[in-house]
């Protein structure tokens, strides 16, 4: 291979070290420019569109654009009976559907003035914690993918499949379960499911250890997350944070402990709290919460006794199918429930649950009819999304991707 020969006619001033070359290498000020991030980008976690004002590779401002997944859910609920309104909640935060159902079911029960059987409460608590683990596995592995770690995602989807099978065994559906109903749950656990869940709960902590062996002390992972997207305690409270994002900033607030619902007052668990409030702390909080959720699942299995799984008022819950074959009254109840629904006394309530992403609330107004007069939904991710601008400033573009992943945003509930 021959050496490269410069053309003989090139002036010496243009060669390296010449006057013209020196003049061409002076420093140029880079003007700020706009960069559209999403909604097609895989790191946008759905349909997030960010308009980033960049100064070179540094984020000067981040403007989130919402509404691309708006379906008018709150208005649609006003035209449905209470039983038919419930499935809409599965489609809000579609990563943790049963926790969304739980909020609406509790709100409706509060307006009806009913108390569900003890076994139904234990089933709800157990599946709410299974849902929390489902959510955190997906978030942590997706965050790993955003930062370049592929292996956790492969392990995570394999582990999530086991939990989705529990969903399917209990409700008949893998995702949109429609399982938590006002008055209890739709049906009892099938034979053998409790043993399968107990066996999974025994081995799951070892899976968490494997996940941490890949990430927690990995120096590349820490370089991508430590000190990135810091939010102080004062900022988190001022911006309306909740859930893991709030606890990562040092506030030990958890609705399961502060305002217990169903049977959360009968289980023991710790509330993980961090101090720094960065992406790494939000990761650690979710890892610790998965360990606590397994503890709660095991306590539910230990304390769950045989019994009814819904109230016996068949104007609110459907009668057993065996009764419908021999009782005209049961058949009428079933027909009326799934056509006209039931009438809820006039009143209003705000009911919130500790969903995997934070406080998910339902403000439900009843006017005495068989349809909600108003159903205002308090999504968990809306407050977190609005803080992206504050969190991302003065960070590199690649850090903005890690910040978005650590906030655990799902636009089904944000856009509604």
Curated annotation (Swiss-Prot):
NCBIfam families: NuoD (TIGR01962), PRK06075.1 (NF004739). It is a peripheral membrane protein. Gene3D superfamilies: Cytochrome-c3 Hydrogenase, chain B. This is NADH-quinone oxidoreductase subunit D. GO terms for molecular function: NAD binding; NADH:ubiquinone reductase (non-electrogenic) activity; quinone binding. The keyword Translocase applies. It comes from the Bacteria. Belongs to the complex I 49 kDa subunit family. Its EC number is 7.1.1.-. NDH-1 shuttles electrons from NADH, via FMN and iron-sulfur (Fe-S) centers, to quinones in the respiratory chain. The immediate electron acceptor for the enzyme in this species is believed to be ubiquinone. Couples the redox reaction to proton translocation (for every two electrons transferred, four hydrogen ions are translocated across the cytoplasmic membrane), and thus conserves the redox energy in a proton gradient. Disulfide bonds: none annotated. Keywords: Cell inner membrane, Cell membrane, Membrane, NAD, Quinone, Translocase, Transport, Ubiquinone. InterPro entries: NADH_Q_OxRdtase_suD, NADH_UbQ_OxRdtase_49kDa_CS, NDH1_su_D/H, NiFe-Hase_large. It is found in: Cell inner membrane. NDH-1 is composed of 14 different subunits. Subunits NuoB, C, D, E, F, and G constitute the peripheral sector of the complex. It catalyses: a quinone + NADH + 5 H(+)(in) = a quinol + NAD(+) + 4 H(+)(out).
